[in-house]
From Swiss-Prot:
Protein name stated in the entry: Protein YNG1
Residues bound to Zn(2+) 1: 158, 160, 182, 185
Keyword hit for Zinc-finger: yes
Miscellaneous comment: Present with 861 molecules/cell in log phase SD medium.
Gene: YNG1
Entry-linked SUPFAM superfamilies: FYVE/PHD zinc finger
């Protein structure tokens, strides 16, 4: 047990408390033997010796009491530290499980794209009032099959220059060359609130166009 305690003393606060108990039995035994010796002197008829023995006996008893009180205090302190350690370990394990769950969901092949049910020409159907997500699947055709159909002069969008599939979001810049973007390509998981731009350049261009229109109206 001593080997295990020494091996884990740096990693577990429970073993640091055990180290405080190493000398406790020896101290108690030594003090009890001293009390026994003093008690023998107390039984002698020498009155001054009896008084001195009583005083020494009281001192030893007080020392033993303080020794036990100190160990009780150490025990309570280490109990609190152990509870804190358990709480920290529990929170760490919980956070680790959440991270593992997210990593598992984001593994390649873990997410299956929905089948496309309907082809949509997004360049004609694009709305400028509010950008909302849209699922535009093609009947009986998976995403991989649609990629092969790019050679059939289908409309392509997004930075990936692919056809429309799954949830997509439109750039609020009317002059954006890509117009619509797949959620996965721009790091979205749900429809953005308010205006959304695919890049800083698109946002600056849109703001300049809007500013120019306002100036023309004032004139």
């Amino acid at each position: 047990m001593e080997h295990l305690a020494n091996e884990n003393s740096d990693s577990d606060i429970r073993y640091s408390f055990l180290s405080t108990l190493d000398h406790l039995p020896c101290e108690l035994i030594r003090s009890l033997r001293l009390m026994q010796t003093i008690d023998l002197f107390k039984n002698e008829e020498d009155e001054p010796g009896m008084e001195r023995a009583c005083r020494d006996l009281l001192l030893v008893a007080t020392y033993i009491n303080d020794l036990v009180d100190d160990q009780i205090h150490f025990l309570k302190q280490h109990k609190k530290e152990l509870e804190i350690q358990k709480s920290v370990t529990k929170n760490f394990n919980s956070s680790l499980e959440n991270i593992k769950s997210k990593l598992t969901l984001e593994e390649p092949g873990a997410y299956k794209e929905p089948k496309l049910l309907l082809k949509i020409n997004l360049k004609k159907a694009k709305s400028r009032e509010r950008k909302e997500s849209i699922t535009s699947p093609t009947i009986g055709i998976n995403q991989g099959d649609v990629t092969e159909g790019n050679n059939n002069q289908e409309e392509v969008y997004c930075f990936c220059r692919n056809v429309s599939y799954g949830p997509m979001v439109a750039c609020d810049n009317p002059a954006c060359p890509f117009e619509w973007f797949h959620y996965g390509c721009v790091g979205l998981k749900q429809a953005p609130k308010g205006k959304w731009y695919c890049s800083k350049d698109c946002k600056e261009i849109a703001n300049q166009r809007s500013k120019s229109k306002r100036q023309k109206r004032r004139k």
